[in-house]
Curated annotation (Swiss-Prot):
GO molecular function per UniProt: iron ion binding; S-ribosylhomocysteine lyase activity
Membrane spanning residue stretches: none
Protein known as: S-ribosylhomocysteine lyase
Binding-site list for Fe cation: H54, H58, C125
Cofactor(s) required, per the database record: Fe cation
Subunit structure: Homodimer.
Pfam families membership: LuxS
Enzyme Commission code: 4.4.1.21
Gene coding for it: luxS
Length: 158
C-alpha cells in the first residue's frame, strides 16, 4: 500500500493553527503544484463542526482567490481540523499563511454576511442546508486570536 504523507505526520507533535508546506510536485510538462496543510485546530483535541467547516470552505474558496492567483483547491480534512490547499507554482508557508490570515479576517468581520458566501443554494451545493455562518465566524475569530504559525512544531506567528 502506498504511503500517504499526511498519515506519516506525528499529529501529537504539531501546534495548530499553522500552515505547513507538505511538498511540491512537478508534472510531466514541467508544471509545479504545491500542497499545504492549513491546520486550524489542534488534532485530537478539537474539531470544527461540519456546518461551520462547510461555510469556511465555501467562503475561503472565494476569499483566497481574491488574494492570490493559482489556487487549485481548498478542501477540508475528514478529521475536521483544517484543509489541504493546493496551488499552481511554488509558494512559501509564510506567503500562504498571510493569505489565510487576511481571508479569515474578512470572514470574521461584521461586514461579511450570507451574501458573501458563495454556493449556498440548493442548485449550487450538495448539502446546502448544512452551513453555519455564525460558526464559521466564531471559528475564524478563535483561529486568529491564537495566531497562524508558519511552522507546525514551533510557534512562529505571522
Amino acid at each position: 500500500m502506498a504511503e500517504v504523507e499526511s498519515f506519516q505526520l506525528d499529529h501529537t507533535k504539531v501546534l495548530a493553527p499553522y500552515v505547513r508546506l507538505i511538498g511540491s510536485e512537478t508534472g510531466p510538462k514541467g508544471d509545479v503544484i504545491t500542497n499545504f496543510d492549513v491546520r486550524f485546530v489542534q488534532p485530537n483535541a478539537n474539531a470544527i463542526g461540519m456546518a461551520a467547516l462547510h461555510t469556511i470552505e465555501h467562503s475561503m474558496a472565494s476569499l483566497i482567490r481574491d488574494r492570490i492567483d493559482g489556487m487549485i483547491d481548498f478542501s477540508p480534512f475528514g478529521c475536521q481540523t483544517g484543509f489541504h490547499m493546493i496551488m499552481w507554482g511554488e509558494h512559501s508557508s509564510e506567503e500562504i499563511a498571510k493569505v489565510i490570515k487576511s481571508s479569515l479576517e474578512e470572514l470574521a468581520s461584521d461586514e461579511f454576511g450570507w451574501d458573501n458566501v458563495p454556493g449556498v443554494a440548493e442548485k449550487e451545493c450538495g448539502n446546502y442546508r448544512n452551513h453555519s455562518l455564525f460558526g464559521a465566524k466564531e471559528w475564524s475569530k478563535k483561529i486568529l486570536s491564537e495566531g497562524i504559525s508558519t511552522d507546525p512544531y514551533e510557534r512562529k506567528v505571522i
